Amino acid sequence: MATLTDIGVAATINILTAFAFFIAFAILRLQPVNDRVYFPKWYLKGLRSSPIKTGGFASKFVNLDFRSYIRFLNWMPQALRMPEPELIDHAGLDSVVYLRIYLLGLKIFFPIACIAFTVMVPVNWTNSTLDQLKNLTFSDIDKLSISNIPTGSSRFWVHLCMAYVITFWTCFVLQREYKHIASMRLQFLASEHRRPDQFTVLVRNIPPDPDESVSELVEHFFKVNHPDYYLTYQAVYNANKLSELVQKRMKLQNWLDYYQNKHSRNPSKRPLIKIGFLGCWGEEVDAIDHYIEKIEGLTRKISEEKETVMSSTKSLVPAAFVSFKKRWGAVVCSQTQQSRNPTEWLTEWAPEPRDIYWDNLALPYVQLTIRRLVIAVAFFFLTFFFMIPIAFVQTLANIEGIEKAVPFLKPLIEVKTVKSFIQGFLPGIALKIFLIVLPSILMLMSKFEGFISKSSLERRCASRYYMFQFINVFLCSIIAGTALQQLDSFLNQSATEIPKTIGVSIPMKATFFITYIMVDGWAGVAGEILRLKPLIIYHLKNFFLVKTEKDREEAMDPGTIGFNTGEPQIQLYFILGLVYAAVSPILLPFILVFFALAYVVYRHQIINVYNQEYESAAAFWPDVHRRVVIALIVSQLLLMGLLSTKKAARSTPLLFILPVLTIGFHKFCQGRYQPIFVTYPLQDAMVKDTLERMREPNLNLKTFLQNAYAHPVFKAADNLANEMVVEEPAPDKTPDLVATKRGSRRFNSGSAETFT
């Protein structure tokens, strides 16, 4: 079990590591050769030019202005200087609201920490319960926790009052933040520039028709049922094979660029390659000619495949993007049932074109339920099997367990410095390593489930990651760690005493989570700003592949916030903070340092680095709110169970009302604010349409929407325009009959539609 000395060693290691990362970043960002790595967002916006083009030869690679090194930490105040409205214009609402999650943590935990250290720590410290318990492993730092309060003590009333303070304050902050972000979302949508998704809905599960193709059926259906507002449609094609060919060609082009650059450095020698297995065997040929030939052949295949996709009705997917003349028409269509059969002609608000995950649009809609069931089972087993490495991590936090497993290492382990390193630093870094591959696995699972937008993929992945963190990192660490630390106590006492030992031991797991917070939340966040991996990859690409300025821009990897991994990780800190605030407040300062440091670092990254792939207008906030509420309820239930083992019979029943009040609060927020994040108000749509009609009376909306939702691999294809030509019915008139290939079918008792 980690002692105060071990925590001090871990803090020293992580503080020095974080400081080293900041120093390295401050120096690297000043070098002209790294400018595109640390400021890619400004290059993508066209607001920054390369400093390599100016100055002497040495100044193209190294910053020779020594005065700039004196101000090497000025990036911190610069990151905080940009006001929030300007930041929304610069980076989008998603990025700004993501930053507000860190502010939410500071708003919740700073007042709680002040109260806890003023009231709770003296109450816990001024006891000697742990000293009187036999066969119990503890350290001095555990005397600051509720474990040091004797069984049946009246001091538990203080912890009860603290639980009420935590609950009411957290709910108050959550409600104000929910209200503010809902207002920000409505204001953002009202002031946003015209975008294709504002006029478009995605229609799925289009029923097959023997007389008409999907394209003809879509046009006919919406001309008949939305005659006044329907404008045009974009068919959805299964172009996955074409995408694979395009990706393959891009890889071949990279190899061609590499060998052409190599040849340009040494024109007297043509580069050669072997065309056998892995380039190690086979005939030796001219590399440039070889790749030119392969690219030409693949280009012909791409052209043929594109023609096949565009001309074959089998490539059409039973889905379409349908656009309307006004936002009002799109709102009505997306929020109403289109057919008597509620399983057909399903409509939803279309994601913006950047947000679409095209590979999943080709999946049959009927498969989605089966796919999600399969993934649910797979996720259960993934969570179960990951308990093994989590249990292994807990053995690292227990010196006695390591010494029993490998007794020959006991002399080395007992060295004070080594012991402090193992207990204070190694468990946190080991857990971090085991979790590295998890986000990639969860993203693959989310893609298999069939979500059609990147934002929904990230939200589902975040949901899975959160559940995994809660079960394995939080619960499993507590249970396994308690069992390993108090194994001797379990074996030498009666069964009736075991719940008491568990009740005492759970608060004592705070030391393990402190080490994890320092590794992940301190050094990990500092490592994010260094961008070591993108730095190396950029320079490798710049040396081997880049020939033009366009190539250099493509070599930049600005990255994104990474909501699917970042938000669940933040939620783990909310759980830890709320659970341990009333039982072991020593955890709170470490969490506050994380929230403050992460806010500054990620604000800098959002301003200078990250380039979001999509904009959802903070649609993820209901998930954030719900998970904080779950963390609050978990903290109440655990405190309830903890006090029951402490025989606090008079105070424990008063905790039962807290989960009920918290659930009621969540239901209120869900009914009051969540609809704003799910639907778009008709009133706002009409206002925006009216203003646009007054400002731009001659707007040609069809031209604006014509190729907005064409698949990226053939978005510029001219022959798609023919499918977009639609006659506009005259306003305020009875719609003309729409031509159709369908035969006459009179409705009678024998032809009634069946519902499946």
From Swiss-Prot:
UniProt family annotation: Belongs to the CSC1 (TC 1.A.17) family.
Disulfide-linked positions: none
Functional note: Acts as an osmosensitive calcium-permeable cation channel.
The protein's name in its UniProt record: Hyperosmolality-gated Ca2+ permeable channel 1.5
Compositional bias (Polar residues): 746-756
Region annotated Disordered, chain positions: 731-756
InterPro entries per UniProt: Csc1-like, CSC1/OSCA1-like_7TM, CSC1/OSCA1-like_cyt, Csc1/OSCA1-like_N
Chief localisation class: membrane
Keyword list, A-Z: Calcium, Ion channel, Ion transport, Membrane, Transmembrane, Transmembrane helix, Transport
Superkingdom in the source lineage: Eukaryota
GO molecular function, one term: calcium-activated cation channel activity
Topology versus the membrane: Multi-pass membrane protein
Keyword GTP-binding: no
GO cellular component terms given for this protein: membrane
Compartmental location: Membrane
Transmembrane regions listed in the UniProt entry: 7-27, 101-121, 154-174, 373-393, 425-445, 465-485, 510-530, 574-594, 628-648, 651-671
